[in-house]
Amino acid sequence: LQWARKRKIPSIQHDALLGKLSVSTQEGRLRDGTHDKLYSYGGRGFSVLRSDTMERIYDSGSIVEESHAMQYPKLFNSYAKSSVNITDTQDSRSDSKGPECESLAVAYSGTRVIVFVGCERPGTISIYSFNSNMTEGTLESIYSGAKTVLGTWGEAFDGGLLTDMDTDDIKYLPPFQSPTGQPLLVVTGSDTGTVSLFHVRGLDNPLPNPRVNSRVPVKPLQSSPLPESTPKSSTKTSSASPIKSRQGKKLRGKKQNKTGNTRFTYRNNKRNIKFKAGRKNNRN
């Protein structure tokens, strides 16, 4: 970099500084082959674009990483590898793509839009609520598929304490599409070979509502601030009724912790949104 050369900083490529950070070799490149700016890769957050103009009206900024560092510090930017201790992988993906927001699903709660964001590496789902014009987002809670940070990733998996790692895809099923008649969130974990069903409770009128107001004047783009008090995980457990698979077999799962309660306020009425653990299929 010209900036580093002028200041005689040869150690800028040291691993403890910027040496391990993956950056583009094309963006910021000058004619002489040097770079005056660095462009790192995405995967650390998510954005909302208008479908008609492709204008970006919201960006999560650094809130995904910051919230994971606060709520799940031992899983922060971790990477599941069978033979490695879970805590030893903490911060191991910070120089690459961080949490890697990989999958997304949308639900509706009255005039609010609920967005579920699946993060690949830590195996988590961040839940956000938006106003009707999708310009103001608030982090509500984070669900983690890792029920322990003790031992290796492989030991946690064998003990049934690890699910939904590498959330390649998530899908929200409204009541009229759900086999239970209740709102469901379907989550796949490619690393763990699992498919999980979660009951989504507390949604106000959870039917799809395509009348999202996109004509409201857009506010300047900015990252949403981290809530003053971050929701903590509840210690309550629940046992949902078994769900039949397509083969007709009943899949019985273990009890799981619920995520922390999430509160929304509509017309001075408080409603809670929380997961209820559903059943899982057999691991591949």
UniProtKB/Swiss-Prot annotation:
Ranges of Basic residues composition bias in the record: 246-257, 268-284
Chain intervals for the UniProt region annotation (Disordered): 202-284
Ranges in coiled-coil conformation: none
Protein name: Gigasin-3a
Tissue: Component of the organic matrix of calcified shell layers.
Composition bias type Polar residues, residue spans: 258-267
Low complexity bias (residue ranges): 223-245
A Pfam family per the record: choice_anch_I
Signal peptide annotation: none
Species this protein is from: Magallana gigas
